[in-house]
Amino acid sequence: HQGYFKDQGIDLHIQYSYGGPELARAFNGGSVHIGEMGLPPFATAYQQGMSARIIGSSVIQQLDHYLAARPDIISIEGLAGRRIGILSGGSCDDYFIRKILATREIDPNGDVELVPLGKDYGKPGLIADRHVDAAFVVEPQLARGEHEGLLRVIDRVADYYPRYQWGIILASQAWLNQKMDLLGRLM
């Protein structure tokens, strides 16, 4: 937005998506040719035929990704029969919550309801307003929600994945075949 890409002679349009599956659809439709996505949604999309390759890494670290719930829910076991907010079906959140629930023998397909939040993702008010009973929340919204008594942390993803390949940069096969110079300049 400050002209960096234009100064490099690159005509770039930035498009936001709400999770890896949505981005994979944009790749498959040809409207996106370079992007960043979580590794689990990429692996799924690639197995389903997405014509893209990993060209870089954006983050490898512990995940500062916390599962927060209403203050009256004190553990993962308390989520049985509840609504849990995730970014989107097939997103990293979906992958993470399924792992967390499985360790407590809670069936993510029957014992809870997973609610895609899309553009509302990360808003602590969703828990306070009881739109969902729990959701993944990151800073600074997490500290604000705890301070205001809207939520409590009941688990963290880093306990399950101490070092995690959080984000990958991918490019469409078409651009890898035809626009390597441009990809190099973008990177």
What residue ranges belong to the model's regions?
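Short, glycine-/small- and polar/acidic-enriched structural segments
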Residues: 1-119, 123-129, 133-139, 150-157, ...
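Extended ligand-binding regions for polar small-molecule ligands
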Residues: 2-6, 166-187
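Short helix- or helix-capping micro-motifs
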Residues: 145
